Amino acid sequence: MIMYDVKITAQRKADYKDLQAKYENPIEHTCDVQEGQTWISHDGMCPEGMCESAWESMHKFVEALARGEGDFYDGWMRNPYSAMISCNDGFRPVSFLLERI
């Protein structure tokens, strides 16, 4: 089976300080992903240095793109071999563009 590489690009990073102040316990280390940062997934595997929480949110889409699948949710993306996925951090979500390459 042919497996494609998938490029993962951090597109946007939000920071909801009001929600953090109201609900979050103080933490030592926050997300260090930078907008524009990229990773390449080979064979649908988690790239080195990828945030585990972000990977958990996106891995099913990365694996599907790596297998050549696409057109998620019946035409959701202009490029059928891509997806826009956000990590599951409700205080500092990052939006990632996944693209089959």
Which functions belong to the PLM regions below?
Residues 46-57:
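Short, Lys/Arg- and Gly-enriched loop/turn segments at beta-strand edges
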Residues 58-101:
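Short, compact, well-ordered microdomains
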Residues 22-45:
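Short, flexible N-terminal segments of the mature chain
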Residues 2, 35, 88-92:
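Solvent-exposed loop and beta-edge segments used for protein-protein assembly and interaction
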Residues 9-11, 42, 99-101:
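A structural detector for beta-sheet-dominated domains
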Residues 10, 15-25:
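Short, structured beta-strand/loop micro-motifs enriched in basic residues and often containing a Trp
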Residues 2-8:
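Short structural boundary motif marking the start of a folded domain
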Residues 6, 41, 94-96:
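Hydrophobic residues positioned within well-ordered beta-strands of beta-sheet architectures
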